[in-house]
Amino acid sequence: MRPFFIPRLMTCLAVLTLAACQSRERTTVDASSQSPEAAVQQSIALVRAGDFAGFWQHALPPHDYAMLREDWGQTRAGEAPLSDAERTRIDATLQQLAAPDAAAALDAQLQPWLADAQLRYGDQLPLLVGIGRALAARAIEDDPRLTDTQKRHAAALVDALGPWAQQAPWFDPARARQAVGVVVATARELDVRDAQSLRAMDFDQAMRSYAIAFHGLERMLALYGLELDKALASARVVPLEYHPPYARVRVEYQLLGTPLSLESTLVQQNGHWYDQDLLENVRKAHRQLAAPATAGTVAALP
């Protein structure tokens, strides 16, 4: 069974997310020293703007941010090299997206398959979405990296997205043509040439490429009725507890008309407020990255 075309287009955007591109300076107001609510609201604003480098710089203390950037390079250097098959597949995808007639060529391939897919799977879509929801719920429950609060929020997200996924016009030819245009436009903005350039990017290049791909994904999902920017714009931060150096807030927002919320504990360091779970996750990842080298060093000592 061939996958639906939307996941295929999203895969293209995922590849493009890794693209190298030019960096730019950010100009944001540091709200983390003002209040816990202002710190969280600024994080949301940075994500909405696609300023992921700015988000990390805002969301982490200076030492941890520098550590994150250094760990990024070490992680990339330690990755297994791409196989010949992987490199060939990525290069072919990028070349196809970069071709002058990319949009027309992809649309010509997509439209017949789209009509066939509607005949084959149109009536089964509610069932397939239901299966997907069940699998997602199980994966969330079994994920050891998520806190109980995060699991509840993720499960609520899946529940909110389910009805939309069942009713979205996935097989509409005009929307599919527009979605292809978004993917091709995103590829041209990123201007990535081959698989090697994906592996050679530094932290700043990666964050900038994430921004381009993120906005491309936003535009594509909006074609099918899922407006991520609208959801982010609706977010408001409600204070719950304030006992420095700790505080607790609730982020409330609307997704597809469904009210959702997520509680967060913040910790104050040097006058700035940071999300406790995010900070601990970054430090845990650093410890795990450093563990093999530390073990090797200890073993070598007499």
Per-range role (PLM):
Residues M1-M10:
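Bacterial N-terminal signal peptides that target proteins for export
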Residues T17-A20:
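C-terminal motif of bacterial Sec signal peptides marking the signal peptidase cleavage site
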Residues Q22-R24:
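Bacterial signal peptide processing site
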Residues Q34-G50, F55:
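Short, aromatic-enriched amphipathic alpha-helices that serve as compact interaction elements
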Residues D51-H63, D194-A200:
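Short, well-ordered alpha-helical segments enriched in acidic and aromatic residues
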Residues P61-S83:
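Short, charge-rich amphipathic alpha-helical segments embedded
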Residues A80-A98, L221-V237:
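A short, amphipathic edge element
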Residues A99-Q196, Q205, R248, P259-P292:
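Short beta-strand edge/turn micro-motifs at domain boundaries
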